[in-house]
Structures are given as C-alpha cells and as structure tokens.
C-alpha cells in the first residue's frame, strides 16, 4: 500500500498533467476553427478544378496531345501510394487509422501481384509504415517547422510525384488522407491522382461545352492544368488532415482531462481513507496508553 506521501505526490503529478491536457485542448480548439474554415474553403475549389478538367477533357477527346498524367501509361503494374499523416501525436487514433487504411491497401495490391511504392508525407505515417513496409518507402517529406500548411508545401510534394512519374517509376498514384467530417469523425480516404480521375466530376453538357473556345488549344491547357490539379488535390488533403488532427487532438485531450479528474478523485479518496485510518490508529494507541497509566 502506498504511503500518504506517495499518494500526495501522485495527486500533485496528475493535477499537473491535467493542467497540460486542458491547455492543449484549448489550443487545439482555437486551431481547429481556423483549420476547419481552411478545409471547407478548399473543397469547392478542388471540386471545381475537377469539373474544369472534365469539361476540357471532353473537348479534347482522345487527341494524341493529351498529357500522360491524364491518360496514364496504359498499365497498372506499379503503384505509388502518397500517405499523408500528421507530424505529431497526442491526437487519439487519427494517425493510426490513416496508416491502417493505407496498410490494408498495400497488402491487397501485393496480394494481386502489383509492385508498391510508398511516399510518406508526415512523420507519424513514416514511423508507422516503416515497421512493416520500410523497404517499400521510396520518398518522405516532413513539415515539422511549418505552423500552417501552405500551397507551396503541397506543390513541393506534387512536383516530386510528377518527377517520379516522368522518370517512369510508377503507373498509378493514389493519395491517402483523412477527410474531416466533425470533431469526432475523420474518414480515411483514397483519391487517385495519376491518371487524373475526372470521370466523377460534373462535366458540362455537350451543348454547354460548345460555347467554349480554347487558346492556344484545349490539349495544351489541359496539360498545364493537370499538374496544378495534382497540387490542389494534395493541398486539400493536407488541409483536411490539419483540421482532422486538431479535432482528434481536442477530443483526445478532453478525454484525458476528464480521466485525470476521475483519477484525482480516486486518489484523493484513497488518501483521505488512509489518513483517517492513521489518525484512528493513533487515537486508539493514545487511549490505550492512558488506560495503562
């Protein structure tokens, strides 16, 4: 049984931890609002970019001048998985659920006889995936010193991905991230980057498409837009991740604060019981000594 001093020290330690978790919750809540606004603002732009690509692709048709970023290599033997996670922990299962989702995808591709390469964006994803798939990780990018994600960060990743594709290092590229739904809900998501998946984007009807005139030509515009679209989709993923991370962190720190409060109550109760028992024992000894006299 711990002594009164040990219990007192433990209570003080838990109270100090509770102050930290409470402060972290407040910081996460403040950052969440900004991150959520940024993620929600990026969605319409990202979706509209896909619609524009779909419209131009419809106008181009099957022209030979279309970039291979749009059409692909014609094969799907080598897959590059761009896995986006956070740089830090203390955010519940946020990072682990993205890594687990990507890990399951890797296993299914390997089982199908495909070659898999992994590009880790974020420290936590790298730390998780390297244990099982360290040999498959070909590239990694971290933003430890970045306080707020900027488009330049996404563009850096996009340029590396496009460079790898131009060198013939993969056939298909898929982006993994966590889509922010609410403070307690972040959904692991996979989005194909290369070949550009614009089939689901709302394209204009043929009558509406006829009014557009492209200069110098639709194929050239499409070739310029596709690399930017890749950067835009990665930027959206990073913003969604930032909002999801703050939401998960706020929830995790709230749970930790409440758990610390419950532990303090239990330890305080144990401390008071032991202290009362000690006082009672001392009183009995005093009374017994007085009677002996």
UniProtKB/Swiss-Prot annotation:
One Gene Ontology cellular component: plasma membrane
Pfam family, one: ATP-synt
Keyword RNA-binding recorded: no
Sorted UniProt keywords: ATP synthesis, Cell inner membrane, Cell membrane, CF(1), Hydrogen ion transport, Ion transport, Membrane, Transport
InterPro entries, sorted: ATP_synth_F1_ATPase_gsu, ATP_synth_F1_gsu, ATP_synth_F1_gsu_CS
Disulfide bonds: none
Cleavable signal peptide: none
Membrane topology designation: Peripheral membrane protein
Record GO terms (molecular function): ATP binding; proton-transporting ATP synthase activity, rotational mechanism
Keyword NAD: no
CDD domains assigned: F1-ATPase_gamma
Main subcellular localisation: membrane
Any GO BP: proton motive force-driven plasma membrane ATP synthesis
NCBIfam families listed in its UniProt record: ATPsyn_F1gamma, PRK05621.1-4
PANTHER family for this protein: ATP SYNTHASE GAMMA CHAIN, ATP SYNTHASE SUBUNIT GAMMA, MITOCHONDRIAL
Subunit record text: F-type ATPases have 2 components, CF(1) - the catalytic core - and CF(0) - the membrane proton channel. CF(1) has five subunits: alpha(3), beta(3), gamma(1), delta(1), epsilon(1). CF(0) has three main subunits: a, b and c.
Entry's family note: Belongs to the ATPase gamma chain family.
Function: Produces ATP from ADP in the presence of a proton gradient across the membrane. The gamma chain is believed to be important in regulating ATPase activity and the flow of protons through the CF(0) complex.
Name of protein: ATP synthase gamma chain
UniProt lineage: Bacteria, Pseudomonadati, Pseudomonadota, Alphaproteobacteria, Hyphomicrobiales
